Amino acid sequence: RMRDGKMDQIFYDAVGSNPIIAAVKSMEDIEKCCAIEEIQGIFILFGDVCSIDRIVKRVKDAGKVAMVHVDLISGLSPKEISVEYLQEHTEADGIISTKPSLIKKAKELGMYTVLRYFLLDSMAFENIRQQQHMVRPDFIEVLPGVMPRVIKRICGSVKTPIIAGGLITDKEDVMAALSAGAIAVSSTNHQVWKM
C-alpha cells in the first residue's frame, strides 16, 4: 500500500499480467473470481461499513489486488473521511470513485485510484480531460466500455491509463476495448473472467 518502489507497482503489475479485472457484486462473485488464478485485480462494488473489512480481507487472502468502489459502500458518505475509514480499517489497495475529491484524498493517503466516468455526451468527454489534470488518478475507468472509437479518442487525449468497464460481455468486447487503447477491462461477467 505504500507508494514507494515495488508496492507502487502492484496494481500496474496486476493489470499488466492480466488485463481483465473482475468487478464483483456479491460474496459468491468473490469466491468465483478468487478461484481463477489468472484474475489479479478485483473491483469491489458492494458491501457496507460493517462488512467491507471482511470482504477486502477475503480478496487479499487470495493474493489479489482489492479496489473498493467507495461510492457504492452502504453507510459511507461521499466525503473524504470515508476514504480515511477504508484506509485505516481495511486492507484495500485503493479506491474507485466518481468523485474527484475522494480520489485526491486517496492519493494523499498512498492508495491506488480509479476515477470512474460515465460517458454520456461530449461534455463528459471534456470533463475527463480537465479533471485528469487536476486530480491525477492512477487510472480512469470509462463506462460503458463498449465504445472503441470513443475509448480511442480518450486514450489519444489523456496521459492517464484507461480501463473500459460496463456492458463488456464477450471476447469481442474485450479485444475491441484493448485494441482501442484501454490498458484493461473491468467486467461483472463470469465468462469474461475466464478468458
Map each language-model feature to its residues:
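Conserved N-terminal beta1-alpha1 strand-loop-helix module at the mouth
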Residues: 3-66, 74-76, 91
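Surface-exposed amphipathic alpha-helices with a cationic face
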Residues: 9-14, 56-63, 87, 103-110, ...
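Short beta-strand/loop segments at the ligand-binding rim of alpha/beta enzyme cores
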Residues: 12-20, 62-71, 91, 109-118, ...
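Catalytic beta/alpha-barrel core
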Residues: 21-25, 40-49, 67-75, 90-100, ...
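Short, acidic/polar
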Residues: 23-35, 79-85, 123-131, 170-174
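Conserved, mostly hydrophobic/aromatic
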Residues: 33, 99, 177
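Glycine-enriched alpha-helix->loop->beta-strand junction motifs that scaffold or abut catalytic
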Residues: 36-42, 89-92, 108-114, 133-139, ...
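Glycine-rich phosphate-binding active-site loops on the catalytic face of alpha/beta enzymes
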Residues: 44-47, 144-150, 166-195
